[in-house]
Amino acid sequence: MKKSFFSVPRTLPLHALTTFLIGVGCVWPLSLSLGLTAPLSLCLTACGAVTLLFALLDCMPRLRALAYPLLLLAIGGSALSLRGQFSAVGAALTLMVHGQPLALAAYSQELSLLLSLVFTGIGASLSRSEQAFFPLALLEIALLFIVSFLGAQIGAASLLPLILALLLGGE
């Protein structure tokens, strides 16, 4: 029997929602704790674009293998947008840890985009796994540890997407 070019998997809505929630749930608290001043809409747009990419390629079985190479290409392009400024970003991160909260503001949009792409890609991997509850719980604990280590006061609302993704991923 010939495979169709486009078929919608039964679990697509759950996987897409979980992917999006993991991306937003990781990037939003990290952005707040790092003092990144990029608008939340940039994060939502990047997470939505990666989620849409994975959802569309899940519907096309013959092209499904292109999802991660395309994501890696986008991450590489985002990292190249910093063009040799990695040492400056590292120095700004060191200054931020030592009490200069506005040190990373100059790199806010690039870092928000990079974090959104990376964490939504991780979310896409975790949302498609049957045993994703414990890795997702470990990711949430690590995120809480990083946020508390940075000493930032973030609202509880920024943690809700990741908690909801944890509950959805446990099904």
For the regions a language model picked out, list residue spans one by one.
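Linear, non-domain "peripheral" regions
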Residues: 1-171
